[in-house]
Amino acid sequence: MHKVHIIYSRIFQMTVTYNRAVSTESIHNFVSIMSYWHGSLVKSIWKEYAIWIVLYHLILFIYRVVMPIFGWADYCKKVIENWTPHQDMTIPLEFLLGFFVTTVIDRWRKAFQNIPYIEICAFAVAAAIPGRIRIINKKQNEVRAPGGQDLRDVPAVEVNHPVQRGPEAPAAALPMPGAPERPAVALPMPGAPEGPAAIQQPSVDVKLTARRTIIRYLVLSQILLFREISTKVKKRFVDLKCLVDSKFLTDEELKILSKEVKCDHYDSYFLPINWAFSILQEHKVKSNPEFINAWNVIRDWQVKLSLLRNGDFIPIPLAYPQAVFLAIRFYFLVCLFTRQHLDMDDKKSIDYYFPLMTSLQFIFIVGWMKVAEILLNPMGEDDDDFELNNIIDKNLYIGLAIVDTECGKHPEIVKDTIGKDCLPFYPQNDDDNERNRALVGSTKNINLSGRSDTPAASPSVFYVNINVKVENPTPVIVDGARPPPSPPALPPALPNPNEPPPPPPPAEALRADQPRHSLIHEVGAQADPAEANGAQALSPVLPNPNERADEHGHSPVIDNEAQPSPPPAEANRAPIPNQQPQVNGNAAPASPRQAKVPDDPH
């Protein structure tokens, strides 16, 4: 067992965090980032680069020293010159790496999102099984909870909720709506002594033990799965006996776990989750919302674990990483020959001694490939892999704290001292007081031509008339400029009573001079004379298009002797209700009282 603890001893944190070094933009960020060793680019590629540069200089020695002895230098030079133009075109490194790294990062992100954390489950369990209640044990030696906690020193606490024994429980055990909270209750176990001696014996907090056990089972399910997909967790918990020594399992639970898992080929992480569901069903009514919420969050816990398991079972198809890794390594294998400095006389070039540009290309391309290799399995032992052991410890500690020591506790409720302005506080010497500004829209503080968003303070307001009737058009005010008012309409001339009225014009003349949207009630020859006279009196007379308008744009006044009725002004012309429109050039024979004015289609 001590060997397991030595293996798990954390000398340094595996996941490298560098956010503090790049908290502000500065010229020192590059130096700060490049100063890291664990998880760095240099650490991941220096071995392969050392092998490559040694092979490069070995081939350089053969080409410059050995080949001239046998007279093969010119032949090798021609072969290498023929390879060089086709090297970059036949192996598309950027294309292969781009798609591959994108796919790997997407799987890495999904794996990170599916790592379950215990906080939401602990809050839901604490809400589903609230309060505390103690039951007197029969023997003082049997005072250990399943997790190994010694309960002999735990003092008695108040009981806020009764114990629910199931359908056989008496009706008095269920709280009525509005009933006061019950006092502390100590329920004796069968065969336990009665009287003062029973109060002095140790007791077990049933609800507290249930909450702690559910959290322990959830963390246990996480450990059982991580042992199958992570080598770091496997080294910490070599076998199930290590879980008993670490108090994640009891001896009785280990026997049940060993008996129920008949086949070693399948995982067993679902059994502790099943136990947690059973405990939750025993301590809560199913119809309560808190029970449903706790059920859902535990189900989400299982779903995330199953997604992690499926991602480990079915990785990216093997041919894809093989093609990418082989293409990159073969490319730089060819570079050992094609990037040689072939001109023996040009000794001033830096490539004559060291391949500078090829080395930079090797660092960038191979480093890019190493990123994909590291992220391909984030459950491994690389520097930037997930810290699963730390996640297990955190889930256990935080979960037990929420359902045990911090359950049902809060500070005393007092009135806050925040003012009505609710302004944030900054120290007087803090630069953030001047830097921090409100997050508002990008065009909120732009003032165009002195206008404001408040209508009362706006110097010019737009009025838009969308009425389809055009008899009385509404003027449009733009930028405070109002059009000149129209002159008042001229009153119609009074008819001369001494002169007889002229005969009505024939229907053909009216039909020829009629505009498209005019409303004319045609009086036929078969209509009654009285009705025809009434229709003539009510029908408007169209102005003559040959007549000229006055200086104000209105039609001239027409005497009653020349026309049957004066034309009203265009601005004051109102629709005449009982009037029949023309249909297909013929007036509909209807009474003036029954005629209707159709709506203007425009």
From Swiss-Prot:
GO terms for cellular component: chloride channel complex; plasma membrane. It comes from the Eukaryota. One of its GO terms (molecular function) is chloride channel activity. Its main location: membrane. It is found in: Cell membrane. Residues 482-507 have a biased composition (Pro residues). Keywords: Cell membrane, Chloride, Chloride channel, Ion channel, Ion transport, Membrane, Transmembrane, Transmembrane helix, Transport. Residues 510-520 have a biased composition (Basic and acidic residues). The chain crosses the membrane at residues 50-70, 85-105, 313-333, 356-376. Pfam families: Bestrophin. It is a multi-pass membrane protein. Residues 477-602 are annotated as: Disordered. Belongs to the anion channel-forming bestrophin (TC 1.A.46) family. Calcium-sensitive chloride channel subfamily. Forms chloride channels. Forms oligomers. This is Bestrophin homolog 25. The gene is best-25.
